């Protein structure tokens, strides 16, 4: 392993601000990707519940879709209007089956 860079006082060498932002944005990108994946998985489970036709699973699936989509908006992963579209379409599908 390469020796660690240190300052004159012996502490770790500080990074430039731009480097910190790059690292932070990479971390956030991974977190956002995993949350998007989770949201898509919940929507697929809801679609499977619709195909099965079980009313209780449809209702609980719809609640999960609402919850995950609202959290995505709060985190800034989805835009408000896209979330509204997703929820509206899910509700229409659920009402058609119930």
From Swiss-Prot:
Keywords: Ribonucleoprotein, Ribosomal protein, RNA-binding, rRNA-binding. InterPro entries: Ribosomal_bS20, Ribosomal_bS20_sf. Transmembrane segments: none annotated. Belongs to the bacterial ribosomal protein bS20 family. It comes from Chlamydia abortus (strain DSM 27085 / S26/3) (Chlamydophila abortus). The keyword Ribonucleoprotein applies. This is Small ribosomal subunit protein bS20. Gene3D superfamilies: Ribosomal protein S20 (1.20.58.110). One of its GO terms (cellular component) is small ribosomal subunit. Binds directly to 16S ribosomal RNA. GO terms for biological process: translation. Residues 1-21 are annotated as: Disordered. It comes from the Bacteria. Residues 1-15 have a biased composition (Basic residues). GO terms for molecular function: small ribosomal subunit rRNA binding; structural constituent of ribosome.
């Amino acid at each position: 392993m390469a020796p660690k860079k240190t300052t004159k006082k012996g502490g770790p060498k500080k990074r430039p601000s731009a480097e910190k932002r790059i690292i932070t944005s990479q971390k956030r990108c991974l977190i956002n990707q995993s949350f998007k994946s989770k949201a898509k998985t919940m929507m697929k489970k809801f679609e499977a519940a619709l195909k099965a036709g079980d009313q209780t699973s449809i209702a609980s699936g719809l609640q999960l879709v609402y919850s995950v989509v609202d959290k995505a908006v709060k985190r800034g992963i989805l835009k408000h209007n896209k979330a509204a579209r997703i929820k509206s379409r899910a509700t229409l599908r659920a009402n058609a089956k119930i």
